């Protein structure tokens, strides 16, 4: 994760883009609790997921336009997606302890520390999932989807593992509880008394 710290000072974005992406990062890490002011649900209303996906897609499009030199979506690669994720990382709200911190590996540290705030792995993973879907919905083919690139998957795995160690929590998938096997059909009671 040290390569992220080095990236923070070297960004190609303008101040307005920084503010716009900071706002997008905030909406990515916090859940939207707003609902429609009209009491009923209309047929044209999008779900929270669809709205967030649209905002994320627009934010990434703005990132591409403000990139120096500007990038077209067709030229975007997994490396550009990683650059975007590393840039968003500085707007995170999750404390990730460094190896030198006395609270490294403690899920509930007893005191504050100077460790950096990062985007939580779950937020980054969800963001990439939404952008991956949006790319294909906007005409991109699954084979050329930069959000599904191997480098992006490896980066997310690295973030997950390093945050799990630093924060002392597990990101293991919860095992599904299997339903109990069906009981054999009940057989009718046979009466042994004569009629």
From Swiss-Prot:
Check the record and name the InterPro entries matching this protein. ALOG, ALOG_dom
Residue ranges with Low complexity bias: 28-38
**Where's the motif Nuclear localization signal?**
173-177
**Pfam family, any one:** ALOG_dom
Q: What sections of the sequence does the record tag as coiled-coil?
A: none
What does the UniProt record say this protein does?
Probable transcription regulator that acts as a developmental regulator by promoting cell growth in response to light. May suppress organ differentiation in the boundary region.
The UniProt family comment states:
Belongs to the plant homeotic and developmental regulators ALOG protein family.
Protein name in UniProt? Protein LIGHT-DEPENDENT SHORT HYPOCOTYLS 4
**Origin species:** Arabidopsis thaliana (Mouse-ear cress)
């Amino acid at each position: 994760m040290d390569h992220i710290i080095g990236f923070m000072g070297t960004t190609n974005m303008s101040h307005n883009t920084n503010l716009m992406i900071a706002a997008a990062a905030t909406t990515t890490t916090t859940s939207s609790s707003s609902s429609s002011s009209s009491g009923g649900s209309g047929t044209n209303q999008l779900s929270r997921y669809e709205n967030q996906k649209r905002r994320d897609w627009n934010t990434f499009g703005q990132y591409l336009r403000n990139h120096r030199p500007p990038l077209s979506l067709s030229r975007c690669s997994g490396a550009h997606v990683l650059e975007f994720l590393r840039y968003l990382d500085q707007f995170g709200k999750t404390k990730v302890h460094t190896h030198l911190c006395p609270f490294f590996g403690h899920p509930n540290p007893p005191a504050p520390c100077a460790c950096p705030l990062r985007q939580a792995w779950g937020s980054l993973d969800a963001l990439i999932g939404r952008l991956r879907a949006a790319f294909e919905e906007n005409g991109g083919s699954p084979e050329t989807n930069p959000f599904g690139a191997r480098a992006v998957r490896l980066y997310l795995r690295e973030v997950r593992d390093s945050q799990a160690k630093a924060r002392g929590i597990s990101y293991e998938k919860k095992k599904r509880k299997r339903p109990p096997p069906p009981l054999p059909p009940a057989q009718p009671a046979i009466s042994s008394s004569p009629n």
